[in-house]
Amino acid sequence: LLTMKFFPKVRASFLCLFLTFLLILNGSSVSGIHGWGSNFGRAPLLERFFWRNMDFAYPDEASRQVAIVKGEFIPENSLPVGIEVWRTKLFVTIPRWRDGIPATLNYISLDTNRGGSPKLTPYPNWAQNKAGACGSGLTTVYRIHADVCDRLWVLDVGTIGIGNTTVQACPYTLNVFDLTTDKIVRQYTLRPEDTNQNTFIANIAVDLGKGGCDDAYAYMSDELGYGLIVYSWEQNKSWRVTHSYFMPDPLAGDYNIGGINYQWGEEGIFGMSLSPLAVDGHRTLFFHPLSSRREFAVSTRILKDEQLSQDSYHEFQVLPERGPLGHSTASVMDDSGVQYFNLIDQNAVGCWNSLLPYAPINQAIIAKHDEAMIFPADVKVRRGLLWIMTDRMPVFLLSTLNYTDVNFRILTVPVQEALAGTVCEATPWRYVGNRVWWDR
């Protein structure tokens, strides 16, 4: 301090830096947004939201306490599994695997919540999240999709519980919301022949063709019934596709995640991602069973034709394996043909540029963190950002979560920065189609 008295410019600079440090520190603690230095990629992961356990935006604290006393809300029983982003809404889904889940489809306002652990607001309202209210309420929702026509595609599987405790309270029903009005514009109940006694549908992909908003198809993966249900918006009709590639790999049922060794040998088709439109006017659906380390693909030209889809075994393509730590949950592909896929064995997200052959040498890890990313359950690309939901699902299901620790996170990373310097970075070629690149 004595020395600095004779150097006023140095002293001023020091004070400036010190005050800046205090402002940054204070801002971080107020906002609740923390950066996680990723082990891979130039851009750090940003922890946008985090929770020890989930909470809901009741009208007042008295209502919340009444719900807790009645057992309608049990904070430790909520596990978030799916996310979606539309404008200033961040949607979060929570299946009713246990008692005390007040709402299965929820959102966070990105306008009013800049970080921290915000309470979830039921979407579109409390009344339409009533369990067992078939036709008027949502019972259990897993993953969802918002399309460019401002529609939110929501499959209500109608179940309460999980595994041996499952009760089919309502039929499988596809609900499509107009996000500009928060009203359901289409409600479709799956046909009995679309499902079987083992059906478990936890994912949906939505395909928009050249014909605009009416040229829409939804693909729903039946993870335990080993099928794919296709729904046509224009025809207002559904059909089921079966193929042996939807089944699990018997050699890929062993998992080591979050310090737990367990076996999920029955897990079939789960993750799905759609390519950009190819020159033939169709997309490619990439998919993988959860208990597998391999990717598969089929043209949507096959899936969108009910008759053709029943007899096109050889139209389905087998791609190489991702490697020994290649279990993957959700995946998504952006408009340039880059696929992003959650690698649950590695607490990471990987990438593949589909203009290159599908092989480990053409894949990279772009986000990884051994604390923040235990079991990445969902992934989306929106507005130039990669959004990742992590939820420690195996610990929740097979052990006990520590509710003094952060268990659930929503993380983001800028796509361009995440891909920079990797084999997935943009190539000078234009996306045309995938078949030629698979065969190279």
Indicate where each model-derived feature is located.
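Blade-level signature of beta-propeller repeat domains, shared across WD40, Kelch, NHL, RCC1
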Residues: 293, 377-440
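Short loop/turn segments immediately following the C-termini of beta-strands
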Residues: 95-97, 157, 221-225, 233, ...
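Surface-exposed loop and turn segments in beta-propeller and other repeat-based domains
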Residues: 45-72, 116-136, 183-199, 238-264, ...
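Blade-loop segments of beta-propeller domains
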Residues: 79, 108-167, 185-192
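Beta-propeller blade signature
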Residues: 103-113, 169-183, 231-234, 402-418
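Beta-strand-rich domains and repeat architectures in extracellular enzymes and scaffolds
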Residues: 33-104, 142-143
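Short loop/turn segments immediately following beta-strands, especially the blade-tip
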Residues: 108-115, 180, 233-239, 298-310, ...
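Beta-rich, blade/repeat-based domains predominating
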Residues: 74-87, 132-155, 193-218, 247-284, ...
